[in-house]
């Protein structure tokens, strides 16, 4: 089949090359310029970059749906997914250039990936059941939450935590010291060879790429893994920082403050709720304003300053509105009568009178309930907002649902959708509001002021992020959320992978071992799978298997080489590939490849002194999340193979290759969804 006809694969490869500089700890930032608004932002996020690419084509939409689905599920790993889409698109094109049938490419590549996933599970690092979070030493680390009292005397927002300024863009390549983190106990090796010889063959290939692909995990039970002992949250956070060390320090401080509030000295998946971690961005302010605080920190119009001063320190009655406070806000099931036309003598005045009437009723409801503070998920009518300000009632708009839920749990307020639902159960008590100040001055950003809202037993932490360069604000917020979710996934799963290319290197070695196998059982396995097919199909599967697996491995070759170059260890990809070949030889000569990789990457330096990055005399292992990494591989390969099949059907105007693989007499079970 002519490779030039596979336009879809070529488009994937073209779009994926834009994220090469985003791999590794030393990322090269990209400016994104909006030709309509003439504004620009600075980003190192493949997810943000995708939002600004031309995705009008069918291939672009498929790529967008795949990455959007992955980002929605994990909030991390999108760069790996994006990069591997390009790497495996190139690998598939090479297979087509060799004249390999599409059906064999799909079958062997999926088998190879599943085999690798089963094999690398042995390289997992198991966290202890409870990771000590050092919360007992919070005050010595700079966190001071004693300013919050039950009476609502919160003090200045800038005093809760010692300032942890984020570096400027020019200093983003500076990393802090990396002490040795984990002590391990080697366990017996569990190899992945002959992984699927006792299993039925299942080939899943879905075009519904926006669905969660976790059910594709067709691997054996997880083997025993290395255990982390005597480890603190500090070491785990540094291993997952991936070059975002200052931002990860902020995440670590937020988690410690959270543990202190719930009075826990240890951290596990039940005590760290990622939905109770919020951010507040202050573009244009110095990095000294960056801090972590207890409660909900947000921005409100400067007109509310007098109201907040009046309410400061007083226990407030709070209302939570899970909707909008506007006259036009209607129930989702409300429809205007069909074929009915409303005619008024003075249409403009009538509309104005209707809005005035609604504002009067809404204002009366609020006054009757004696409400001081209203948190609204949506927008608020400006006229109602002004009336409430005159009555010293504070209204905060655009409040996320998880924040409403947090205040509902601690104040007893039940969220309402409309003001007509207000009753004695829907109003909460004991909420407090204060102005955030620095050096006795109110913090003001773009005609808005910073406030903090707290309550007794409120399970909510806010990270206030600031930068003098407004264009970097989105990037800093993305980095914070990425680090937070990495730590969240690690604690939820209780396992991490060694990073820095460790599992990719093990996958390459495993695939090379599969290629080199020539035992009778290997060929018997092939013949058993294709016994119902023609001898040509059987011979082709055996003949092309090595080439297909080799192309699959080249995707990980590309990943590791770009990663090593971006880490500053090598000046060119050729030098990085030479290093990879040497490492593969060392692995092959070792009696236990997994033990070799574990030993090497548990003490491997992440940075290079020649790049001007300060490192300590000790090293810290780099870690990757387990499920986000594996799902990124799965989604990437499934997207590439979907495009491959679609291209093949367009070129040949036939789907005969599917009919062969879906034969009812076949011993293997192939599912094309």
Curated annotation (Swiss-Prot):
Source organism? Xenopus laevis
Instruction: Quote the subunit structure annotation.
Output: Component of the chaperonin-containing T-complex (TRiC), a heterooligomeric complex of about 850 to 900 kDa that forms two stacked rings, 12 to 16 nm in diameter.
| Database matches in InterPro entries | BBS12 (IPR042984), Cpn60/GroEL/TCP-1 (IPR002423), GroEL-like_apical_dom_sf (IPR027409), GROEL-like_equatorial_sf (IPR027413), TCP-1-like_intermed_sf (IPR027410)
Protein name, UniProt field = Chaperonin-containing T-complex member BBS12
Superkingdom per UniProt: Eukaryota
Tell me which Gene3D superfamilies the record gives.
Answer: GroEL, GroEL-like equatorial domain, TCP-1-like chaperonin intermediate domain
What is the gene name? bbs12
Which residue ranges run through the membrane? none
Alphabetical UniProt keywords: Cell projection, Cilium
Say which family it is in. Belongs to the TCP-1 chaperonin family. BBS12 subfamily.
